[in-house]
Amino acid sequence: MELKVLFSEDPAFVLSRAGHFLSSQPVHHNLILSTLHARVAHAEQGRYWMAIQRADIVGVVLQSPLTFPATLTPMEPTVATAMADAIAEAGIALPGVNGEAAAAARFAGQWSERTKSAAIPFEGNRLYELLQTAEVPAVEGKLRQALPKERSLMILWSRAFQQEIGESADGTELRVDRGMAAGQLWVWEQSAEVVSMAISREPVQGVVRLSGVYTPREKRKHGYAAACVHALSKKLREGGYRCILYTDLGNPTSNSIYRRVGYGAVSEALRYRFK
């Protein structure tokens, strides 16, 4: 059966063509769905590929911003191979790939063979979904949205977070401004001091992804991040949303925190760097 790879730079077209496929698994496809919706709302350069078999979409890969690694949906090995081949044949130099473990591994392996570059796995992630809002030890303070006067602090913390997870901090100010305008930046306040932050991404198909959970080093080991995530997750769940987040498998502390809050593992993902 013939497998075609269709390229586009138009996120609206990709949503119109692949929307049904992506919405069929809103948790597994959330990262790509939310990125596409964001690019439609706020124009930013991007590259998008759709794998088509018998007129059906069977996989999607995107790269946006263009300095970022590619992100892919879960897909069959043959589809991941075809995607890597098509992108390599187009002469596009990807810095890396992120995605569901098996698909990312197959893509990275094929990319390495086709481009004669090294594919280095450097981080394992786990996708979690909130199954229940478990009770956690009480922590003094409260959850609230970040205030305009805290913009500089949110930018500082967001850059520090990106640095800690090994991602580019390009565009941080713009993302913070958009997040604050949309009411998506949240903080944990204790005794009139902001001690932790978290981001709730735009809801897509009833799913909200939490990200950017950060506490400065001098404020860690007090339970602030757990309290912030617990309160935010509970608030979103009570609003009828499903909550998800990704964690670094190299950080057992954060994984245990999220399990205590009520999150359960869904799947694993891998991040590769190409050199």
Regions found by a protein language model. Give the residues of each.
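Short amphipathic alpha-helix that is part of the acyltransferase structural core
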Residues: 1-31, 133-167
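Conserved donor-binding loop and adjoining core beta-sheet/short helix segment
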Residues: 3-9, 20-26, 33-92, 96, ...
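A short, aromatic/hydrophobic, helix- or strand-capping loop or linear motif
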Residues: 28-37, 98, 166-174
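Acyl-donor-binding surface of acyltransferase catalytic domains
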Residues: 53-57, 62-140, 272
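Acetyl-CoA-dependent GNAT
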Residues: 54-55, 62-67, 133, 156-211
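Conserved acetyl-CoA-binding loop-helix of GNAT-fold acetyltransferases
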Residues: 77-86, 211, 215-217, 221-237, ...
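Conserved beta-strand-loop-alpha-helix junction that forms the acyl-donor binding cleft
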Residues: 98-104, 245-256, 271-275
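Recognition helices and adjacent regulatory flanks at domain boundaries
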Residues: 187-190, 200-203, 222-235, 242, ...
